[in-house]
Amino acid sequence: MKSLPIDAVLPALREALAGRHEAVLEAPPGAGKTTRVPLALLDEPWLAGQTILMLEPRRLAARAAAERLAAELGEGVGERVGYRIRLESKVGPRTRIEVVTEGILARRLQDDPALEGVGLVIFDEFHERSLDADLALALTLNGRALLRDEPLKVLLMSATLEGERLSRLLDDAPVVRSEGRMHPVEVRWGRASQPGEHLEPRVVQTVLQALADEPGSLLVFLPGQGEIRRVAEQLGEALAGRDDIRLCPLHGELDLAAQRAAIEPAPAGTRKVVLATNIAETSLTIDGVRVVVDAGLERVPRFDPSSGMTRLDTQRIARASAIQRAGRAGRLEPGVCYRLWSETQHDQLPAYGTAEILQADLTGLALQLARWGVEPGELAWLDLPPAAAYAQGRDLLQRLGALDGQGSLTRHGQAMAELPAHPRIAHLLL
């Protein structure tokens, strides 16, 4: 088995979890935490044959993580390692490690709040701070406190330097820190980007330059599907007749076959140019990539309480995301990252992104908390849900008939909460 940076701290992690029911693991991109940690803890005495649940922020990452873990054991998925994602499940009677998406756990908790038979919940990539991850952690901690007789351990794994803040949330849990990625990544800065500047020509020019100057496949980060489509069209024209270059889009709306084509090794004698959204920022190893081209932008949903509408905003990424993206180039060998902004602009970026819970529509969260029977203040959060957005979500639920005049869940609301859809859609479906 190939050595990874995370291996050096696995004894300390085992010791931390043997002595406490919570721990935080801080490890940069490429350290190997997703692949190594669940297997390292599988035979710990305190687990006593129970299951490990590991949460991933996206379906593609969950499936890929399960496949890598199973391969490490020399087995197929569905034996000791399985996964559950929306509309797809691959687990068996021998499964001890279940890799699930965050929304799957949040819904499982509603039916099984004590998580019977589970001995450890691992929140991988917790630094992404998705709404589902925050909700799942809050419900896990509350269900454990109220309903568990046997210990349930919780491990938060983060690639950013927020370990102390996460530790405070978990009653000053021990923080275990791993050193850097396996291979160095050279960062090459671009000129300062300008507001309103068309992104695609700069991306295409940089990709063509990288193909000429560097070996290996490329991973290109773009904000959305529209930019991916336009860059693919322009690169297709520029690379016409080049049978050695394969263009592969990668975003959440693609089917499984297209997603696999993007992350699997390029055929012999060819190189890939993977055009991806931030779906490729964490948890995925795209074989053969040693060059990253980062446009430095992302598209995020932002809720406006004054209008009750959610809009998609394109914004600059945080420095933590830029580090994550660059790390994709150093997974398997020394790499290069082209950033399409200047070093001066980089220094002005926020250190971390804004947690989804602070800028999202909270109607779905309000419905799940009503089903759980609590108010936000009764649970443990890294960031408390904003009062205005939460109140607006509750108001919409009452207008949809999900809550009665006293704010209690109705039978219609119970049925809505069981559907994996926004409450507006669930109401229409019922």
Where are these regions (language model features)?
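P-loop NTPase motor module signature
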Residues: M1-L428
